[in-house]
Regions:
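Conserved acidic functional residues
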Residues: 30, 101, 279-280
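Catalytic histidine-centered segment of alpha/beta-hydrolase-like enzymes
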Residues: 273-281
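Flexible "cap/lid" subdomain of the alpha/beta-hydrolase fold that forms the substrate-access gate
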Residues: 11-12, 24, 60-94, 98, ...
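Hydrophobic residues on the short alpha-helix immediately C-terminal to a glycine-rich phosphate/catalytic loop
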Residues: 41, 110, 288-292
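Short glycine-rich catalytic loops that host catalytic nucleophiles or stabilize transition states
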Residues: 267-273
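Conserved HGGG/HGGXW glycine-rich cap/lid loop of the alpha/beta-hydrolase fold
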Residues: 15-65
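Charged catalytic carboxylate motif
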Residues: 37, 82, 203, 284, ...
């Protein structure tokens, strides 16, 4: 069931499943995607007794900015603060967080900056806090090639391309990043409808430019960005899941940052899974949440 809640910045649309008095689990989607990432995860968790919340991030679907003057920023501090504010608005003191890509970044930011709010973390692809100061250093030629869309978004041609071709770009990236996932047009269209949000393009472009220091952030988050620049550790009990065939973020590349997950309990490489692991292997995500919840009981 779709609900909405207001924070100081946003009206956030979200799905809620399971008993209202169950242990809260917040599932956070990635880009280019939306809450449908967790269609195979949320119902089993709800049936297992968890209170499951699946919000649309800023710039997606029914999540709206309250003030036209608020900068349409997709920077990491904003995503993390939105998550904290979402929990505050619903009077949730602590939750298990699950996320990947943009949603994984929001979860990691919240876990690092407000550890008292996070009882456990399932981080799909690992430590997700950006090291913006180091972003000027180039990666391997292969990795630079994987990030072609990010360089594209640094141009006004890229902004125009995302505006005009967001459905076909999503189809292409899904195929490149999860090469073994077979999806149909109805699945694609169900998600890309969320990109009709009038702020989707602006939030996306700002996010990809800001992470390389090529766009200013919202000054409201300057203090948080300073804290994130220190690459703070995440102490919450954590399970990392990584798709063996992730076409944008290879598993080997994330392992060195495991040292920042000081509560790491387990890292699992999922055979044949790609970037959209929660869609491809939802049972693995459900199992990770259940294991962490059991260990915390």
């Amino acid at each position: 069931m779709m609900k909405t809640v207001r924070t100081p910045i946003l009206e956030i649309g979200f799905l809620e499943l399971g008993p209202p008095d169950g242990p809260p689990v917040i599932l956070l989607h990635g880009w280019p995607s939306d809450v449908h990432d967790y269609d195979g995860v949320a119902p089993p968790l709800g049936e297992a007794g968890f209170r499951v919340l699946v919000p649309w991030l800023r710039g997606y679907g029914p999540t709206w900015f309250l003030d036209p003057a608020t900068p349409r920023s997709g920077q990491q501090a904003a995503l993390g603060a939105d998550l904290r504010d979402f929990m505050d608005a619903l009077a949730i003191p602590r939750a298990i967080l699950v996320g990947y890509d943009w949603g994984g970044r929001a979860a990691c930011v919240a876990a690092a900056l407000w550890p008292e709010r996070v009882s456990a973390l399932v981080s799909i692809t690992g430590y997700g806090i950006q090291d913006i100061a180091a972003s000027a250093r180039p990666g391997s030629a292969e990795q630079e090639h994987r990030y072609w869309y990010q360089w594209y978004f640094h141009t006004e041609r890229g902004r125009a391309g995302l505006t005009a071709n967001r459905v076909e770009m999503t189809r292409l990236l899904w195929r490149l990043w999860s090469p073994n996932w077979v999806f149909d047009d109805a699945t694609l269209r169900a998600t890309t409808a969320s990109f009709d949000n009038p702020d989707f393009v602006d939030v996306t472009i700002q996010s990809y430019r800001h992470r390389y220091g090529n766009a200013p952030g919202d000054p409201a988050y300057d203090d948080l960005e300073v804290r994130l620049a220190a690459q703070p550790p995440i102490r919450a009990p954590t399970i990392v899941l990584h798709g063996e065939d992730d076409g944008v973020g290879p598993a080997a590349a994330s392992i060195p940052r495991d040292r920042l997950l000081t509560g790491l309990r387990e890292r699992r490489l999922i055979p044949r899974a790609g970037h959209f692991l929660a869609r491809e292997n939802p049972a693995d995500v459900v199992a990770a949440v259940v294991r962490l919840a059991a260990s915390a009981a």
